[in-house]
Regions:
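Beta-strand-rich binding/interaction modules
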Residues: 77, 86-104
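Intrinsic disorder/low-complexity segments enriched in polar/small residues
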Residues: 7, 96-99, 125
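Loop/helix patches that line or flank the sugar-binding groove of alpha-linked glycan CAZymes
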Residues: 1-88
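C-terminal beta-strand-rich structural cap/linker in extracellular carbohydrate-active enzymes
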Residues: 109-125
């Protein structure tokens, strides 16, 4: 299982990548920009802040069916997610500092938030 699990390949939720250049735990550990390190950073950030715990309340600030971005507030944080391949704009006013990002982040313009393609950003208010 390339070092990610000790379980049988048949019992895993997702199949093991069969390619010769498939990522291994060892290769991911050595690459600070790897998916493994990214997941560890975001989990550490989440655990540092009570507002981001699983039982935290949230308020949707912007959401449209089949349209990005999705923007919501949890306590003192505003979180914006854009999984699309295009820059997405939400009519949301954000006054805070960027606390965490994955991807290209976002840009605050007057009364809107422009989120880069395939990006995730957290602002601390």
């Amino acid at each position: 299982n390339l070092g990610f699990s000790e379980g049988c390949a048949d019992s895993l939720y997702l199949p093991v990548d069969p390619s010769d250049d498939a990522p291994t735990v060892e290769s991911q550990e050595q690459d600070e920009n790897s998916l493994l390190h990214m997941v560890r950073r975001i989990l550490a950030f989440r655990h540092e802040h009570e507002d981001l715990q699983a039982d935290g309340e949230y308020e949707v600030l912007y959401a449209e069916k089949e349209k990005a971005p999705f923007v919501y507030r949890r306590g003192k944080f505003v979180i914006a997610v854009n999984p699309s391949l295009e820059t997405a704009v939400a009519p949301v006013k954000v006054q805070g500092t960027e606390a965490f990002r994955i991807g290209g982040g976002a840009q605050v313009d007057k009364d809107c938030l422009k989120v880069a393609p395939q990006s995730f950003v957290i602002y601390e208010l």
